[in-house]
């Protein structure tokens, strides 16, 4: 029963998207068009009249067509890519950034590495991490970061500064990207995103990291000067550029369902094709992708 309820919730969310409704209608029309054509051809070969038999066939096939269209119209939620000219394995998926084990996860922060109000939003990735691993001692993460920085008190760090902390079964790279901003907690510029990404790839090489799991760098900060799609393109371009200069680790880009249209992966796939990537594995959206921890 729980699986059925999860599936119903998933389709309720999907039907709220105009892109999914349009895709579903196109798939249904294609299915019934092909069905009618094949049925008419079969009846013509058999020498039978089409009206009654054809109508009966359509009645029988309608439930099959609806089920087929509902499944076939599901957007892709997990795509793995391979590049023929660079060692740069890539995976882009819709899911929960924290839902993994033995991974190196990147979390972007402001240049003071703040972990609490007023400089950190209540639904930020940093706050989510604290709720998962430091809920009884919320100041412990802040103390661990300052210790790694060899600081007794806060001080602004350069863009791209990285602090590595282990928590639970994963390691976390806290990446300094944004500046403090009085009205919106943190703000970020495109050049800061590019610089921090360059530092991230260098860090991965120097520390022999095999794979990084990242959100869309820069998208979680207020007053970002561009939208989510350009930031994804920036992330992909930076990663492949670095890999062409020198081999770099594998990359997993995790998109939260609440952050983007579910057709976003189709756009990402198209841009990856332009960059020379080939999709080697694709998985459709399932109820597990939408039953995530709230942000």
Residue ranges and their predicted role:
Residues 2-295:
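Macrodomain-like recognition of ADP-ribose-binding/processing modules
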